[in-house]
Amino acid sequence: MAAPSGTVSDSESSNSSSDAEELERCREAAMPAWGLEQRPHVAGKPRAGAANSQLSTSQPSLRHKVNEHEQDGNELQTTPEFRAHVAKKLGALLDSFITISEAAKEPAKAKVQKVALEDDGFRLFFTSVPGGREKEESPQPRRKRQPSSSSEDSDEEWRRCREAAVSASDILQESAIHSPGTVEKEAKKKRKLKKKAKKVASVDSAVAATTPTSMATVQKQKSGELNGDQVSLGTKKKKKAKKASETSPFPPAKSATAIPAN
């Protein structure tokens, strides 16, 4: 259904005149304002834009414009509710035709996995075997250590356990060694030892000074003892001579040996 030709020509002429005015305004705005003056319009030489506008008014286009259509682009004159209803029906119809088969997916996955395992990586040499790295990296089962029945092994294990074991008392002792109280105690002990050493040195010097006098006294005592022994021997001989004279009837003859010299 086409509109009458008179209404179309009037609307096109009004649109072309408004377009020409907009072009003139844009040109005036684009001209620089400094050092240049706008040239006056020449009446004898019309512009190309004016000629084009005249041609457009004299020869209207035969194209069908949707915006100027009476039905405004909606030839069926449908409402949005009707369009939504049709879309829902079409969606349900498509869903009914589409079927999902789960059994067909499983073999496809298995094939993809097999292909991936076979084509995994690349061969560096012609002798290299694909998948050899995975076999090497597979963890080997560890063998359990058999308990040793010998006494030497048990003694060694017990000794290692003792070396590795740390008791709470050991930790406390180590912490006490580095504490400030222990440092003060050690300093006091060192002072006492120094005092004792000084006392011993003074005693030794005193003993060294008194040794010559003590040696002299000891020598005197020894000489006195020797003299006393000699006197005791002379007295014993005198007593024996007296007893012999008393027992014998004849008077003893005087001899030099009988009378000891004092």
UniProtKB/Swiss-Prot annotation:
Signal peptide: none annotated. GO terms for cellular component: nuclear envelope. Keywords: Developmental protein, Nucleus, Phosphoprotein, Wnt signaling pathway. It comes from the Eukaryota. The modification Phosphothreonine is found at residues 79, 182, 211. Residues 51-61, 210-221 have a biased composition (Polar residues). This is Protein CUSTOS. It is found in: Nucleus envelope. Residues 1-79, 126-262 are annotated as: Disordered. InterPro entries: CUSTOS. The modification Phosphoserine is found at residues 61, 138. GO terms for biological process: negative regulation of Wnt signaling pathway; Spemann organizer formation; Wnt signaling pathway. The keyword Isomerase does not apply. Residues 188-199 have a biased composition (Basic residues). Residues 9-18, 200-209 have a biased composition (Low complexity). Plays a role in the regulation of Wnt signaling pathway during early development. The gene is CUSTOS. Belongs to the CUSTOS family. A motif (Nucleolar localization signal (NLS)) lies at residues 236-241.
